[in-house]
């Protein structure tokens, strides 16, 4: 049996690096607008903390990285939603970026494939 797969070519990965505990705030904000497929993982930040020596102990290096793949036509709306939910307009809260994806692959149900066949 030949295996086949469907690739998505009009997708963007939005990534937010935020303070520990903020990942759930972001996923809740995404769920409110129907986005269910985000991923959170823990990270450790390095940089200014090390340069401050003993004073660096006061800086929390724990971070969370939230990633979500979205359709390219939804990027602006979802990017803004994450930015506001994570309060990234406050210094020290984190940063985010969007990466265009050349290809992404996952299981797509036949009912969805037939809906978009020929487009």
Q: Can you say where each PLM-predicted feature lies in the sequence?
A:
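Positively charged, small/polar-rich N-terminal and surface patches that mediate targeting and assembly
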Residues: 1-119
């Amino acid at each position: 049996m030949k295996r086949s797969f469907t690739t998505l070519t009009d997708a963007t990965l939005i990534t937010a690096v935020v303070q520990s505990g903020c990942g759930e705030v972001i996923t809740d904000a995404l769920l409110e607008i129907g986005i269910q497929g985000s991923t959170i993982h823990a990270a450790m930040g390095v940089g200014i903390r090390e340069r401050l020596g003993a004073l660096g102990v006061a800086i929390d290096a724990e971070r969370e990285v939230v990633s979500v793949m979205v359709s390219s036509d939804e990027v602006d709306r979802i990017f803004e939603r994450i930015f506001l939910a994570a309060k990234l307009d406050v210094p020290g809260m984190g940063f985010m970026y969007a990466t265009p994806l050349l290809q992404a692959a996952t299981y797509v149900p036949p009912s969805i494939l037939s809906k978009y066949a020929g487009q």
